[in-house]
Amino acid sequence: EPNLAKDQVRAMFDYQTSEGMIIDCIYTDKKENNERNSKPPLAAWAVSEIYKATLDADFVKEIYPKLLKYHRWWYEYRDHDKNGFCEFGSVDGTLEASAWESGMDNAIRFDHSSMLKNDNRAWSLNQESVDLNAYLAHEYLLLKELSIIANCEFNEPDRTATTADYFFDREKEFFYDKRLSSHSSVQVEGC
């Protein structure tokens, strides 16, 4: 149902923070909302799929500025070393909320992680996650396409060409998360 899909996206962005973060959970009792973390960035993909189904350019124009703000939020608040590759994190510095942000709450790849403070209400894991950065690279491509539909300027840095190479371990022939301190691979295959 296209209208339901649009309303779901609108509801998600109704709770976008002033910085651009989309909060994890929204409840009928707002005191229960989880504002400690976000979730993987898939919103531009959702909007792109809605557009393909409806050709509703007005919806894209309505949501596009919020999508772009969310995309920029990742690089501003979840890129500890400002190298263009992001980390999952939390607002309050808790490791648990960082795992929630990944959507893989109990993933063993986070077992030896710690938190690094980026800003007043911005913390990152001490590892850059391959899945997060793959999502962000794909979101970049979709935002570029959606900018044409929304008739908006798009000047975001293109990190898509370097993402796969950065996370690929040629010796093991596998994609791994990277430790921030050494940029060595987190040798965990799978979750």
Tell where the protein language model's regions lie, with residue ranges:
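Alpha-helical support elements that line or immediately flank enzyme active sites
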Residues: 1-16, 190-191
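Structured ligand/cofactor/substrate-binding pocket environments in proteins
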Residues: 1-3, 62-68
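Alpha-helical solenoid repeat scaffolds, predominantly canonical TPR units
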Residues: 8, 63, 70, 157-160
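Residue-level signal for short amphipathic helical patches enriched in basic/charged
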Residues: 3, 54, 170
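Active/binding-pocket-proximal capping segment
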Residues: 11-16, 153, 160-162
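Extended hydrophobic/aromatic segments used for targeting, binding, or gating
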Residues: 21-24, 41, 160-191
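The feature captures the catalytic groove of carbohydrate-active enzymes
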Residues: 19, 23-42, 48-52, 57-61, ...
